């Protein structure tokens, strides 16, 4: 009799686990199609809004990737949602919103208290890579570190140069970005621009780098 009870308990636990997994799958399905009512109902039923999918993305990250604007706004505003939750690639929702040119979502994330700065790649790197001057300026207004270094010491200015985004380079230089920095691949911002085939931008960046070095001579 006791053994039979254990079997029933095990079956019940399996059923609960399967139901939870199915509900989590339902959450991500609703997120991807921007089904706000469905997402709200699932969260109200107790589904964790911070749960990750099989790829390691949270519901908020999936919403941003899927351009599910209504769901993304709902999740950003939800008090239980972690606005800084990273995925397996260590990307935050703000980084992805910046890369996808979603100024509106970046603004919402900042208002929600999401971190503008973090170690490694940052939202400013992603905005510079996307060539979005508005987001770059917004992040700088909220104290984004202008010379933030990726794990291999690549800066936002280098990413802007890599994408041949002249307007972003100009904005970063105007705000004081250091064009003389070199990453671990021995590339400066000018070097990135040259590799991208934009000699005019490379010359501009090298000129600025020379001026920077003259103003900031090495301490001996």
Show the residue positions of the predicted features.
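Intrinsically disordered, low-complexity regulatory segments in ankyrin-centric signaling systems
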Residues: 4, 19-45, 54-57, 73, ...
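Ankyrin-repeat-protein effector appendages
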Residues: 20-26, 142, 175-178, 184-220
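Ankyrin repeat A-helix N-terminal signature
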Residues: 29-34, 62-68, 96-102, 126-132, ...
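Ankyrin repeat domain, specifically the short helix-to-loop turn at the C-terminus of the second helix
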Residues: 43-48, 73-82, 107-114, 137-145, ...
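Ankyrin repeat boundary signal
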Residues: 51-52, 83-86, 115-119, 146-149, ...
